[in-house]
Amino acid sequence: MANYFNTLNLRNQLAQLGKCRFMAREEFADEASYLKGKKVVIVGCGAQGLNQGLNMRDSGLDIAYALRAEAIAEKRASWRKATENGFKVGTYEELIPQADLVVNLTPDKQHTSVVQAVQPLMKDGAALGYSHGFNIVEVGEQVRKDVTVVMVAPKCPGTEVREEYKRGFGVPTLIAVHPENDPKGEGMAIAKAWAAATGGHRAGVLESSFVAEVKSDLMGEQTILCGMLQAGSLLCFDKLVAEGTDAAYAEKLIQFGWETITEALKQGGITLMMDRLSNPAKVRAYALSEQLKTIMAPLFQKHMDDIISGEFSSGMMADWANDDKKLLGWREETGKTAFETAAQFEGKIGEQDYFDQGVVMIAMVKAGVELAFETMVAAGIVEESAYYESLHELPLIANTIARKRLYEMNVVISDTAEYGNYLFSYAAVPLLQEFMTTLQAGDLGKQAQTSTSVDNAQLRDVNEAIRHHDIETVGRKLRGYMTDMKRIAVAG
């Protein structure tokens, strides 16, 4: 198999990278009805598998789980989760031949073996679904020509897919049909019904392509969504402790700070996040973010280049073949960091204190979001896709850190995201060491800002620059669709 994207000519590469259409609410008037009365079999019962299945069942679909025979015989976690939630469970041989839609929600590294196992069992004209297109785009999986191949990609971890659905809402979602596999022309109808069944139509759906989803998803998770949060956590914690802050207090400020800061980001973009600061702190955060963008731009560009070329995926797949030696080593090292092992502060930190004491954290968020967005758009990815893969998903990832620090983030995200996170953070931490030595009183921690005055013209220019960045323009439009957004922060 060859990397699918690299087999396309330049015109097709650009066309697929740039495919993105915001779908109107009216297009989902039938909700999940196209799949009602049909059999949907999910392969895999991890975070996405279980939670999408719960939503789809609650939306009236017939859901069952196909698991490997040994997982059933040994009553592994996947079997327990499916059976404890009242789902029908069977082997591939028992369930796949009856399925109208087979949804592959196993980890990326298992996709090739899973798809090769289920394809011979699928009935003629059935559909195969993914929630991430890595197997199709990067691995180059070849699927039978009578099989329709679709994707529904919720833009958040599986746990949040369920939580937002239970709140009566949903999460923004990308849907796509693989152009090489739509023999009956029903791919879009299947994808729309599946997206509606998960609740995604209530938060906004983009019609995209497998290529655009994969390339933008990899870029977002490696840089701002996971890599920047991990690098920022380690750098800021070490800086606070080195300057005399109690380690437990520093840990809590960082652990819950990202979530509190990005809740403002979710509700009102970078503009609202920056507006939570005093005017002197806002001007300072803006200056810090501009410095960070200059320092980090080449790193962001390298990640985008390696994703587009396939260099990233080939390196990760080589690690798969080596029993995840790099991934597991990086995971172990992260677990031993001072931030991860620090005691928990039992006192309360006020909501505004997270902003006032986290000026450089806000600068990191602003710089990372804007750089990820700008770098994706420069590579041919449409602004709406770049927004969802940089700004919108960030509060959901920050929420995982608030639960159990970096450990929880890396457990919840995919192995693909985790591998990319380590690549970025291991490069970003040394890259930003010198920058961290230039921080002033008031940039991080309890020390007061050294300046309490602001030049009116400078403040005006800063506000204009913040509010008129392209990500703020597209963000205002997309957030207008999400009128039912629910607050998720749990900071204490």
Curated annotation (Swiss-Prot):
GO BP annotations listed: isoleucine biosynthetic process; L-valine biosynthetic process
InterPro entries on file: 6-PGluconate_DH-like_C_sf, 6PGD_dom2, KARI, KARI_C, KARI_N, NAD(P)-bd_dom_sf
Domain KARI C-terminal knotted: 209-344, 345-485
KARI N-terminal Rossmann domain segment(s): 15-208
GO cellular component term of the entry, any: cytosol
Binding site for Mg(2+) 2: 217, 389, 393
Binding site for substrate: 414
Pfam families: KARI_C, KARI_N
Gene3D superfamilies: N-(1-d-carboxylethyl)-l-norvaline Dehydrogenase, domain 2 (1.10.1040.10), NAD(P)-binding Rossmann-like Domain (3.40.50.720)
Active site feature: 132
Pathway noted in the entry: Amino-acid biosynthesis; L-isoleucine biosynthesis; L-isoleucine from 2-oxobutanoate: step 2/4; Amino-acid biosynthesis; L-valine biosynthesis; L-valine from pyruvate: step 2/4
Positions of NADP(+) binding: 45-48, 68, 76, 78, 108-110, 158
EC number(s) per entry: 1.1.1.86
Catalysis: reaction(s): (2R)-2,3-dihydroxy-3-methylbutanoate + NADP(+) = (2S)-2-acetolactate + NADPH + H(+); (2R,3R)-2,3-dihydroxy-3-methylpentanoate + NADP(+) = (S)-2-ethyl-2-hydroxy-3-oxobutanoate + NADPH + H(+)
Note on how the cofactor is bound: Binds 2 magnesium ions per subunit.
Residues reported to bind Mg(2+) 1: 217, 221
Alphabetized UniProt keyword annotations: Amino-acid biosynthesis, Branched-chain amino acid biosynthesis, Magnesium, Metal-binding, NADP, Oxidoreductase, Repeat
Entry's family note: Belongs to the ketol-acid reductoisomerase family.
Function, as annotated: Involved in the biosynthesis of branched-chain amino acids (BCAA). Catalyzes an alkyl-migration followed by a ketol-acid reduction of (S)-2-acetolactate (S2AL) to yield (R)-2,3-dihydroxy-isovalerate. In the isomerase reaction, S2AL is rearranged via a Mg-dependent methyl migration to produce 3-hydroxy-3-methyl-2-ketobutyrate (HMKB). In the reductase reaction, this 2-ketoacid undergoes a metal-dependent reduction by NADPH to yield (R)-2,3-dihydroxy-isovalerate.
Protein name: Ketol-acid reductoisomerase (NADP(+))
Organism: Erwinia tasmaniensis (strain DSM 17950 / CFBP 7177 / CIP 109463 / NCPPB 4357 / Et1/99)
Gene name of this polypeptide: ilvC
